[in-house]
Regions:
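Helix-to-loop junctions at the C-terminal end of transmembrane segments
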Residues: 90-104, 205-206, 323-338, 422-424
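Transmembrane alpha-helices of Major Facilitator/SLC transporters
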Residues: 88-92, 289, 310-334, 345-352, ...
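Glycine-rich segments within core transmembrane alpha-helices of 12-TM secondary carriers
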Residues: 81-89, 153, 157, 176-206, ...
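C-terminal transmembrane helical hairpin of 12-TM major facilitator-type secondary transporters
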Residues: 339-382
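Intracellular juxtamembrane helix-capping segments at the cytosolic ends
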Residues: 60-62, 66, 158-174, 291, ...
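C-terminal ends and interior cores of transmembrane alpha-helices
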Residues: 113-139, 347-363, 416
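Hydrophobic core of transmembrane alpha-helices in multi-pass small-molecule transporters
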Residues: 51, 118, 132-160, 278, ...
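Extracytoplasmic gate region of multi-pass secondary transporters
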Residues: 57-62, 268-315, 383
């Protein structure tokens, strides 16, 4: 009888423990779902602000080379982009310290103004159209103003994007099972800026002219600055200690901030990711100027003078493919191995290169749309995955986002320099350079995957 009572008591205690565990599990799932919904709303507001900014700035960067060429400023567009990404690279070292000193919304807003100045420089250039090339309209003055504002934009871009990485990382850390969805959600909105930007560009350039194009984009950029200023704090109200700890952090000297970024190079995981981050930058620098070239090849003599408008039609499809890929990749990233997905994304670059070569041979305008779709997939997929990998493998480490943006911007700068130096060579030369970096990054990702699999077995 006593034994039966003991067994009943044990069964009761076991059931009570199971019941408590079940309740805790349900409570945890419910809390994560609440955090996800809160995070989703904040990501939505951040995404809309970024989408508005890059609706203005994104189309300018792709069309600026062709637009400035119409005024016989042959390399001004590519030089300004190089100035942006070169300063972006080195400003990334100090971005973390600036972000620690100010709130996210202040960093976003001030950084936004650098983009606005860069866009507004286009107004200056086209104000001088038809004027004598002297004084503020001299070639030297125009090159100086455009490159100065481009360099300022690069400095601001470093704080903007490192802050974006930190903001999204904080939100996704409260619901790790939805990390990929949230980051993919952001980049799908970023790709949507291409669609809106180039539709806007095609209307303005066709019916109102270049001056109106830069004026409206400058206004849009200022609107996005206000959106960023009213952004909510990323920290969860349920985890107030996060914000308190952040505010107590001391701002380290510049030398120590640089050391923090460089010390990551001793980490094998970070070291093998650098070629991949470099490739993402090379892709951006390549398609920003290459799509204009491949479209121009497909046009006849009468159509060439309207090349910027034809480019804007094509890049709308680049944005559309980016939106779809951003959503799909975000969902896949929460279910499958990130490194395997990244390897697949680098192989997608090879497909884009093959069709880009075909576009130069066939010289068919319709094929340019498929080429743009492929480059849009490459850009959005790899941009999303690099942030998800950094956020998952290096949680809470802003210096990893600094290293990522450093490699991105150096890769992009390299591609832009090659674009200028290889102008007298056939256009396919730049594609072979991209292919070389694609092979290197794929090999490095495969080695990193092998190392991780070995660690997991041990």
């Amino acid at each position: 009888m006593a034994q039966q009572e003991l067994e009943l008591q044990e069964n009761f205690l076991n059931k009570d423990t199971e019941y408590n565990q079940l309740n805790n599990s349900k409570s945890q799932i419910l809390n994560e779902e609440i955090e996800y919904q809160i995070g989703k709303q904040k990501i939505f507001r951040l995404s809309i602000a970024f989408m508005t900014l890059f609706t203005a700035y994104g189309s300018c960067t792709s069309l600026i080379s062709g637009l400035y060429k119409t005024l016989n400023f042959t390399n001004l567009g590519l030089m300004s982009l190089f100035s942006t990404y070169f300063t972006f690279a080195f400003a990334s070292f100090v971005a973390k310290g600036i972000i620690q000193k100010f709130s996210f919304r202040v960093v976003f807003t001030i950084s936004n103004l650098g983009y606005t100045a860069c866009i507004a420089a286009g107004i200056w250039v086209f104000m001088c159209e038809g004027s004598e090339q002297s004084g503020f309209c001299s070639v030297e003055a125009i090159y100086s103003i455009v490159n100065f504002t481009a360099a300022l934009c690069g400095i601001c871009a470093s704080t903007l994007w490192v802050a974006q990485g930190g903001y999204v990382d904080i939100l996704s850390s409260t619901c790790p099972s939805k990390r990929g969805v949230l980051i993919g959600y952001f980049f799908s909105f970023m790709s949507a800026s291409n669609i809106i930007g180039y539709i806007l560009a095609s209307i303005l350039l066709n019916f109102f002219g270049n001056m109106s194009y830069f004026l409206l984009n400058s206004v849009l950029s200022l609107v996005s600055a206000y959106m960023m200023y009213v952004l909510p704090d990323p920290y969860s109200p349920n985890i107030k200690s996060q914000n308190d700890n952040r505010n107590k952090q001391q701002i380290k000297p510049l030398k120590e901030q640089i050391k923090e970024v460089l010390v990551l190079l001793k980490d094998k995981k970070a070291l093998y990711l650098i070629p991949y981050y470099w490739l993402v930058g090379v892709i951006l620098g390549c398609y920003a100027s290459y799509i204009f070239v491949v479209v121009k090849y497909s046009l006849n003599e009468e159509q060439v003078q309207y090349a910027p408008q034809y480019v804007s039609y094509v890049v709308i499809f680049l944005g559309l493919s980016g939106v779809i890929c951003g959503i799909v990749v975000g969902k896949l990233a929460d279910k499958y191995n990130l490194l395997i997905l990244a390897i697949g994304a680098t192989l997608l670059v090879t497909t884009a290169i093959i069709f880009s070569l075909l576009g130069l041979i066939v010289k068919e305008y319709a094929l340019c749309f498929l080429i743009a779709i492929l480059w849009g997939c490459c850009d959005s997929t790899n941009s999303s995955l690099q942030v998800i990998i950094a956020s998952k493998d290096f949680p809470g480490q802003l210096q990893m986002f600094s290293l990522q943006k450093l490699a991105n911007s150096l890769g992009c700068s390299f591609a832009l320099i090659m674009g200028i130096l290889l102008q007298s060579y056939p256009p396919y030369c730049i594609l072979f350079i991209v292919f070389l970096f694609q092979i290197i990054s794929t090999i490095c990702l495969a080695v990193l995957l092998s190392l991780k699999n070995t660690e997991n077995k041990v």
